[in-house]
Amino acid sequence: MAVRIYSDSLFLTDELDRMKKVAIQGYRGCFHEQASREFYSEMGEDIRIVACPTFEPLFKAMEDGAADAAVMAIENTISGGLIPNFELLRSYPFRIKGEVYIRIEQNLMALPGQRIEDIRQVRTHYMAINQTRKFFEENCPWITVVEHEDTAKAAIEIASEGLMGVGAVASSLAAEQNGLQILAPGIETYKQNFTRFLILDDSLTVPKNRIDKATLCFTLPHKPGSLAQILTILSFYDMNLTRIQSLPIPGHEWQYFFYVDIKFSTYARYRQALKAARPLMKDLNVLGEYKSAQ
């Protein structure tokens, strides 16, 4: 497993060792890092970033002790859920302890001293291409947009290789960390573009009186009305169903895992709802009980 540990601090080694190591998917300056720093700064904690190439190494890093926690994207308001990540949550023992929402602002950046007219090629991730296509078509059609594996890595390469005439579309954090100049901020087509990130950190304890959200995974008997019964119970106990995702159970035709997010006003009422619904469920797995992000 390849991981990279980053820190912006110039602390002594023992101070660095005391900083919480947070695993993320992506490269220095990516939106995962932005989400991680936003969440932990509110907690008053300094962190070191453990960068992983894909999502499963986040969990491996926590298992191996290379990371103390992980921050993982789970859904986006435009592209929907990251389906493989639901399976990772079910497959590993780490519980959700919080969440954070980040508005995805895409910025066109390049080495300082250039104008948009000087840029001939832009590198970025395919999702960022889809989110910014209209800007390039309407404002700078001479630029060739090239798909890259990661938004932040594109910015890193431009800075490290001194590439003139080449731009990247990435976060403002990527521009700041790599000394790039933002030529055009906020070039995404849809401004209401948010990604939800989950906090997986066993060191965090959330008081019960502050818990107002839970993520569950369960299966149901393969018979008519089984899901409707669960939804009726949740409604009776005033549970707000904010997300439901079904995924096939391998080896079981037309049977599914159900992943559910529910919000509630009191923890006791939530536990009552869970107690009432549990006899109708199979293989209930509480993936996390936490304070929702406002």
Describe every region a protein language model picked out.
Residues 2-294:
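Domain-level signature for soluble enzymes in the chorismate/prephenate branch of the shikimate pathway
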